Design a protein with these regions (language model features):
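Amphipathic protein-protein interaction modules
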Residues: 49-86
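General structural signal for secondary-structure boundaries
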Residues: 13, 41-42, 68, 98, ...
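Short terminal alpha-helical segments
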Residues: 1-36
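Short, contiguous, helix-prone interaction/anchoring segments in small proteins
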Residues: 30-60
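Charged, alpha-helix-enriched surfaces in structured cytosolic catalytic cores
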Residues: 19, 41, 79-83
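Amphipathic alpha-helical binding modules
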Residues: 74-105
Length: 105
């Protein structure tokens, strides 16, 4: 229970958001997605990118980000790409949180 609280607290920190943004950009580069995200509105930018990617490129990106396929089923159908972008950002944030938590131990 404490871990969930610590994760939610971390999401609010500006430095944590910047680290999450950097992790997302790193994974976009690894997937060879040439797209510029802006820290202020990277959720909207990511949603637009996902919508414009080919299905092959999108699958490659999701694989590199390590987003479990079961998460795809819980993305709301009303705006699929916004929901998928949120799932990606949560996954990237979790990577940053775990890296910070275990690198300090």
């Amino acid at each position: 229970m404490l871990e969930k609280f610590a994760y939610k607290e971390a999401l609010l920190a500006a430095d944590f958001r910047l680290q999450t943004f950097a992790q997302l950009q790193k994974d976009l580069e690894r997937a060879q997605c040439e797209f510029t995200l802006h820290p202020a509105n990277f959720l909207d930018d990511l949603s637009k990118l996902l919508e414009n990617l080919s299905s092959e490129k999108r699958a490659q990106l999701l694989y590199l980000i390590d987003l479990p396929e079961k998460n795809d089923a819980i993305v709301p159908t009303s705006n699929y790409y916004d929901g998928l972008a949120e799932q990606i950002i949560h996954r990237e944030a979790l990577k940053v949180f775990l890296r910070n938590k275990f690198s300090s131990q």
